[in-house]
Amino acid sequence: MLWFKNLMVYRLSREVSLQAEEMEKQLAAYTFTPCGSQDMAKTGWVAPMGSQSDALTHTTNGQIILCARKEEKILPSPVVKQALEAKIFKLEAEQGRKLKKTEKDSLKDEVLHSLLPRAFSRFNQTMMWIDTVNDLIMVDCASAKKAEDTLALLRKSLGSLPVVPLTMENPIELTLTEWVRSGSPAQGFQLLDEAELKAILEDGGVIRAKKQDLVCDEIAVHIEAGKLVTKLALDWQQRIQFVMCDDGSIKRLKFCDELRDQNEDIEREDVSGRFDADFILMTGELAALIKNLVEGLGGEAQR
């Protein structure tokens, strides 16, 4: 089981049926296939349990996990530039004239196509968790762009996917700033030793504090000067540590050893049993964390 490292959280904006059996058929039409000789990138679904199962969905207690794989061809720009310059030089010498910009652009496409079959590939996988009980979708990635790309694949697979980023009633940075200013985060949370503060004005500067007590005169001065806390490291019930960001993303999730070792009694040979147990454990903990976090941040924005 791959324990999530980050969370981009989305709210299903209207009621939609997400049944694993039906989804399995819909996702099958978009199973991952490797890049062909002229493909720059390919994305598709793979089994979240890897070699242990061919199923593209894994479901327990209303929680569904999916896995998207992306292959990208790597063409270093210096290699492309060198090949293009050589081709331009050769043609200009043969024709005795300078090539036009449109001709050079056309040549660049030719060069790219000629290099693609020899290009190396970079692969990455993105896990997605659908909480059908709470109507939420979580993507395990650190950027909104990557999350949106994964959601776009799911939307294409299902035909429609009405989701919006989970947003709070109050600006998150104002709540985080108050937690640091007062030294009193919401119940169940504890300030750790890392934060980022930004001035309201773009050219007002950024302060990054690491391994530092945040409830101190130095940080207080920055807050009094108008800086807002945009990232804050927190501990939740001594079970999960993470960084809360002002855009609503939850980064650098770290589960305590007690949690991660909770299913150690399951035999190593029982890979699917361990995956299932860890999935139930992780989603249960994260669902509770998200619920507490939303409450602590002042509640979800009214839709």
UniProtKB/Swiss-Prot annotation:
<dbReference type="Pfam" id="PF04381">
    <property type="entry name" value="RdgC"/>
</dbReference>
<dbReference type="GO" id="GO:0006310">
    <property type="term" value="P:DNA recombination"/>
</dbReference>
<comment type="similarity">
    <text>Belongs to the RdgC family.</text>
</comment>
<keyword id="KW-0963">Cytoplasm</keyword>
<dbReference type="GO" id="GO:0005737">
    <property type="term" value="C:cytoplasm"/>
</dbReference>
<comment type="function">
    <text>May be involved in recombination.</text>
</comment>
<protein>
    <recommendedName>
        <fullName>Recombination-associated protein RdgC</fullName>
    </recommendedName>
</protein>
<dbReference type="GO" id="GO:0043590">
    <property type="term" value="C:bacterial nucleoid"/>
</dbReference>
<dbReference type="GO" id="GO:0003690">
    <property type="term" value="F:double-stranded DNA binding"/>
</dbReference>
<dbReference type="InterPro" id="IPR007476">
    <property type="entry name" value="RdgC"/>
</dbReference>
<keyword id="KW-0233">DNA recombination</keyword>
<dbReference type="GO" id="GO:0000018">
    <property type="term" value="P:regulation of DNA recombination"/>
</dbReference>
